[in-house]
Amino acid sequence: GHGAVRVAKTALQSGANYLAVATVDEGIKLREGMVGAPIVLLSEPPATAAPLLLAYKIMPSIYTPEFAIAYAEKADEYGIRAPFHLAVNTGMNRIGVRYDNVVDFMRKVSFHRALDLVGTFTHFATADCEGTLDFGIQVKRFTEAISALREVGIDPGIVHCANSAATVRYPQVHFDMVRWGVSLYGLHTCQETRSMINLKPAMSVHARITDTRTLPMSEGVSYGLNYRSPGSVKICTVPVGYADGLNRGLSGRTDFIVDGTRVRQVGNICMDQCMFEVDLRTYGTRRRLDPQIGDEVVIVGRQGD
């Protein structure tokens, strides 16, 4: 991928002061890479992960009393606090305490002195969609949950809910912190954001042609021989396959760039290689490509990146 430690340090150097990870291992990798910023795990791991969370100072999300108590008890053994973020389910129905049950949940677990509520968050299901009805419902539920906590004297801590799309499209939900996700890598989450912010993809993937051949009509290519040559095409091989992240489901459904021209990937993508075709026929003023072994192929990105 992009390199977790490198991305984290770049984000911090650019003004971020908090980091989020998807797994405990990701958090540990950052700590071992000398990243000292606060890290929140955006899920609730198994209770057996509690010692690692505490040792590496990774704050988990909490939404079940069983994990909350196990985590707190382990912290108590060490004589330290157990910081966490409360995940609130406002409609995505993936993880979290139901929005109208947050007070009861906190009362159920807050008897344990080690627990330390550092933040409260939710996640939007439709921030990148055209309609705003469901988005508005989630915002309303989340603000009600935050208000309910405050009304009974529970400080929700850092309030955050804006993913990439919401950060760009809805500044009113920035609250105390935003979670810059896929757009951190220069990707737009929806068409609407393209006119609102200028992003440049952080990654490009290039390869070199390792073999070429001109096939007669009806000759097959790759596993299953699902692709058949229409004749007058050159088949070129590049050393990139599904083991490198080029999804096999994209077989025959994606294009590459050679010498500034789009070329069609053909045949099933192999583990470590794939092929594309180049039409050798000449149409009017269309420039005829004739790629050779060693020529550059752009898998992801633009020519010249």
Regions found by a protein language model. Name each.
Residues 23, 43, 124, 163, ...:
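Residues that line or immediately flank small-molecule/substrate-binding pockets and catalytic motifs
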Residues 16-17, 35-37, 56, 79-82, ...:
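Short coil/turn connectors at secondary-structure junctions
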Residues 41, 117, 209, 265-266:
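A structural signal for short, hydrophobic beta-strand segments that form beta-sheets
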Residues 1-58, 62-71, 169:
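N-terminal active-site wall of soluble small-molecule enzyme domains
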Residues 212-305:
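C-terminal accessory subdomain/extension
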Residues 1-14, 68-82, 90-208, 212-216:
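Active-site loop/helix belt of alpha/beta enzymes
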Residues 59, 91-94, 237, 275:
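Short aromatic/hydrophobic contact patches that present stacked aromatics
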